[in-house]
């Protein structure tokens, strides 16, 4: 999904697919203050006021919810309410809005486990060191389909008091192209392209909202 959005934004800016160059960055490295090795970055970054102090964001390209992932037969596999997660050992990657969602929405009785990245959290889940992990919904579908044998999406967490999250393209602070990139994203939203890409690459079936 992110790659499709990147190519669509590039096209809006006058670049064809051959003109797009991909570079690897870590999640934390890309969001740290300082110069960047990219023009814009898509790693499912939620737009937050705290992050906007050190980087720029485009307007939002996807309205995102957080989801709880586990394995079949786990203590929370059949949960249908947030209350049923209160006593679970949940985990998330450091610095993510997923970790914030555990604390603010679930408010578990035991402190959330914090991992360097989603890969480490998945390993902990496979080893049954945690009952479940919280990630954004697109990642939840990927993990349960590809990474976690007998993986299960317990459900989506309800919206937090601070409102719905949005993913945005991340740019260097005060980047000269932030306005142009935002204009491209806005155009893709207005002409329906973003909705079409979400329908093509993402789905919400099988991920009910926990009450």
What are these regions (language model features)?
Residues 9, 33-35, 85, 125-126, ...:
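Hydrophobic residues within well-ordered alpha-helices
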Residues 63-70, 145-186, 204-211:
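Periplasmic-binding protein-like
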């Amino acid at each position: 999904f992110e790659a499709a959005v990147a190519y669509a934004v590039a096209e809006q800016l006058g670049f064809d697919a051959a003109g797009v160059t991909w570079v690897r960055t870590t999640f934390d490295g890309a969001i740290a203050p300082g110069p960047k090795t990219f023009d814009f970055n898509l790693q499912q970054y939620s737009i937050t006021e705290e992050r906007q102090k050190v980087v720029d964001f485009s307007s939002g390209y996807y309205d995102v919810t957080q989801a709880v992932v586990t394995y079949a037969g786990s203590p929370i596999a059949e949960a249908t309410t947030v209350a049923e997660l209160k006593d679970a050992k949940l985990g998330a990657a450091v610095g993510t809005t997923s970790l914030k969602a555990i604390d603010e929405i679930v408010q578990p009785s035991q402190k959330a486990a914090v991992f360097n990245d989603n890969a480490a959290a998945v390993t902990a889940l496979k080893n049954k060191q945690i009952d479940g992990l919280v990630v954004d919904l697109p990642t939840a579908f990927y993990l349960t389909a590809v990474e976690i044998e007998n993986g299960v999406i317990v459900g989506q967490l309800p919206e937090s008091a601070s409102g719905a999250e949005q993913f945005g393209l991340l740019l260097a602070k005060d980047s000269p192209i932030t306005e142009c990139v935002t204009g491209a994203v806005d155009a893709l939203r207005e002409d329906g392209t973003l909705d079409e890409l979400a329908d093509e690459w993402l789905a919400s079936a099988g991920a009910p909202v926990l009450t």
